[in-house]
Design a protein with these regions (language model features):
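N-terminal Rossmann-like NAD(P) cofactor-binding module of classical short-chain dehydrogenase/reductase
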Residues: 78
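Conserved small/polar residues in nucleotide/adenosyl-binding loops
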Residues: 159-166
Length: 166
């Protein structure tokens, strides 16, 4: 199975390392130095498990700046793009998530998209209506910084579901 992961922060890189043990993963980022680090099996973030997995495990993992190609070839796209909270407007900035969804819909509308980013209540339903896609779902992350891969390997809670109306 081919899986693309949009974003290589704590959430994206930890899920990439986890999945790349058994599937082909292409991690996508906008920052060349992060892509180069991952392709050289060095972690661009501080996380003991990620550092160890990149250095020692046989991971089927590559990183790229080319989201279009990565998403076109993917069966699943995990979206771990930043959604910073703006305390002045009291809203999450979901523009990075929406950019990924728009590109996936353009190049591979049949791919299943799993949003791991923090998003507001009702966002998944709203974006599914906007795109006309039932292949978008949300799976919240419960990760600690510097322990992200560990928390993915040994989760305290797993939850994902498409709309019950599907």
């Amino acid at each position: 199975m081919k899986i693309a992961v949009a974003g290589t922060g704590y959430v994206g890189l930890s899920i990439s390392c986890l999945i790349a043990q058994h599937h082909t993963v292409c991690a996508v980022d906008l920052i060349k130095s992060k892509v180069d680090s991952i392709n050289n099996r060095k972690s661009p973030i501080q996380d003991e498990y990620i550092e160890k997995y990149l250095a020692e495990k046989d991971l089927d993992l590559t990183a790229t700046l080319d989201g279009e190609t990565a998403y076109r070839d993917a069966d699943f796209v995990v979206i771990a793009a930043p959604t910073n909270y703006d305390s002045k407007t009291q809203h999450f900035d979901t523009s990075a998530v929406e950019s990924v969804i728009d590109l996936v819909m353009k190049v591979n509308p049949n791919a299943v998209m799993v949003i791991k980013s923090t998003i507001p209540v009702g966002y998944t339903e709203q974006i599914r209506k906007k795109t006309g896609s039932k292949n978008i779902m949300f799976s919240p992350e419960f990760l600690r910084e510097s322990k992200a891969l560990y928390d993915n390997l040994y989760p305290c809670l797993l939850y994902t579901s498409p709309s019950p109306r599907d």
